[in-house]
């Protein structure tokens, strides 16, 4: 599930897309599930 957007924004593989879309580009998983 979704976690802190800031955490994913800085460290997530989806990068800035996490902060904007809340999802990784080309993925259906939300940023909270991306590491």
Swiss-Prot record:
Enzyme class: hydrolase
Recorded GO MF terms: endochitinase activity
Biological process annotations from GO: chitin catabolic process; defense response; polysaccharide catabolic process
Keywords carried by this UniProt record: Carbohydrate metabolism, Chitin degradation, Glycosidase, Hydrolase, Hydroxylation, Plant defense, Polysaccharide degradation
EC number, UniProt record: 3.2.1.14
InterPro entries, A to Z: Lysozyme-like_dom_sf
Ribonucleoprotein recorded as keyword: no
Coiled-coil regions, chain positions: none
Catalytic activity: Random endo-hydrolysis of N-acetyl-beta-D-glucosaminide (1->4)-beta-linkages in chitin and chitodextrins
Family: Belongs to the glycosyl hydrolase 19 family. Chitinase class I subfamily.
Known function: Defense against chitin-containing fungal pathogens.
UniProt name for this protein: Endochitinase 2
Species, as recorded: Capsicum chinense (Scotch bonnet)
């Amino acid at each position: 599930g979704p976690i802190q957007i800031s955490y994913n924004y800085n460290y997530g593989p989806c990068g800035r897309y996490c902060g904007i879309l809340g999802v990784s580009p080309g993925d259906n998983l939300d940023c909270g599930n991306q590491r």
